[in-house]
Amino acid sequence: KNYFYLAALSLAMTFSMGACSDNNDPNPDGGGKDPVNLDYSSENASAWGNYMYNVAMLLNDDATMLYNSWVTDYVDEQGSHGPYATIFKDQTAGAYQSPLSCIEEMIESGMWNIANEVGDAKIKDPYTKYTSGDKEGGLYAVESWYSWHSRDDYTNNIFSIRNTYYGRIDDNDVSKVDGNLSAFNSYKDFDDEGDIAEHSLSKLIASTNPALDEEIKTLIFASAKAIQAIPQPFRNNIDSEESVAAMNTCMELANLLLNEVKPYVNQTFGDPEYDDDLDAIAEQFVDAVVLPTYKDLQEKNKLLLDAVNQFRQNPSNDNFEKACNLWITAREPWEKSEAFLIGPVANLG
């Protein structure tokens, strides 16, 4: 009956159940006791394990359904069937009537949407509440505050923008962050050769407006770097100067994407002569960014489910730690998919 994993698990379950319930009390009573001092019993242990398993099972089901919707079959609003990857790349149904409409979706519904959310909601909402005097409200407004993983989650959100813009997934970005992102002066130091695909938004924009491409790449990296500069954990440093700097940089990126990049792409590449180029970018985006991310999501959430089930059946410190580590691992593709919350993930809720 080791205290470490029992106390940690009881805290995790208390906060998770509080967040998922309709109870607005930020301090649920956990059955009449302080969360740290919950009584251990075989009944409690079984309930906690079952709760973890059901949450992991739902995550696994969602990840599987999402991946299958892109690669196997998806029913759109008009009742058309087919893999969503085909619908997007070939503009066979729904909102995509041209290659340009796909690129617009990538910019506004994808990249702008998450840049704006990180700056204007994920950082600004807690900051506004906290600095207005509602410190408890500010704390509870922090996404992922109970796992102390907010800062890395937000960084991965920005990396999802980078992957979309570059048309390729960076396979070592997280490891470079772990080595200290402040060590890199700019995206030029951070990027590896070949990170930017030939058929990408970056290459297309650079071919006609290299200064704009430079500004986009600079702000993407600056946003990630500013987020990583927030003292860890974010929940304990909501009102820091670094938090304000990160919020402002992300909003600057969002404004650039919506107010300059999207109009520029429409005006410059709206002629049908660019359709083949835009088609190639859409295909590269789906095949090299979306599908690998969702495949990774499916695989990692299956591993998480297996680990949680193993812990449920054989409670131990080692099995608990394995489940915790796999939960953190499974978070990465979730967060890195947020620059393409389009199609099935939006329509299926």
Language-model-detected regions and their locations in the chain:
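Bacterial N-terminal signal peptides that target proteins for export
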Residues: 1-7
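Hydrophobic helical h-region of N-terminal Sec-dependent signal peptides
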Residues: 8-13
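C-terminal motif of bacterial Sec signal peptides marking the signal peptidase cleavage site
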Residues: 15-19
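Mature extracytoplasmic or organellar-lumen-exposed domains after removal of signal/transit peptides
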Residues: 22-349
